[in-house]
Amino acid sequence: MTVREYIKNTWKVFTDPSGFAPYPYVPPCLDDGRFTVLYYWDTFFTNEGLIADGRINDARNNVNNLIFSLNKFGCVPNCVWERGAEYASQPPLLYMMVKSLMKAEPDAEWEKTAVAALEKEYVFWMTERISPCGLNRHGTNMKDRRTLIRDYDNYTRIKLPKNVSDDVKVQTMISLTAEGESGEDHTPRYHRRAAEYAGVDLNSHLYGLESFLEEYFGDKDKEKSQKYGEAKNKRAALMKKFMEDPDGVYHDYRYTDDQRSDVYAC
């Protein structure tokens, strides 16, 4: 059996036993109970495989579940379940999934619904995850101080010092959650200060979203198209200003102390 044949034979469609996800879906793992829910950015890679194997309806159902969650919570949550948005979001790849489906099987009415959802997601990133320098950062949806302290005390994925103040615990958990939202939990890339960095990849994804919306509305709504085009150009200028080094390499930007990271991450 070839690898391709194995993949084709092992796609498995789930129905959410809790009833939260309204559409059947294909999760990132088959048998691990924790990862049989639909995770946000994992779904992009799953969908590329589904589309390649002609399973367009399964890929569309995955996206429909993400859109459902976005409309319910105001962001695409880390994973699709009733408490999925309490933690954070994940890298904004929904527009790439929509683009892939538009190419694989155009559906003008569905595309209108999907693009309306993308505009809503864009508002989330531009209001809840904007930094003072004008670029975007990762963050957390957890606002309750007691919850952050409790989560610090119970954290097991990496070793954390216990004899620290509650303020340190709160700031550490904010950054660890932001790191999780980046999809790279955990990484030395952000020096345990992920919420203080405007990431190259995050801002590149948002540039891609702005470019997609500019193009989509090009022959439908000139005003919207111009708005997203101007936002795209502004982002490109800010990324060049804050992220580009003398050799033309882009680095994550720590806006809290006006420093480019010394880590080559993108």
Describe every region a protein language model picked out.
Residues 1-266:
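Acidic, mature catalytic/reactive cores of soluble proteins
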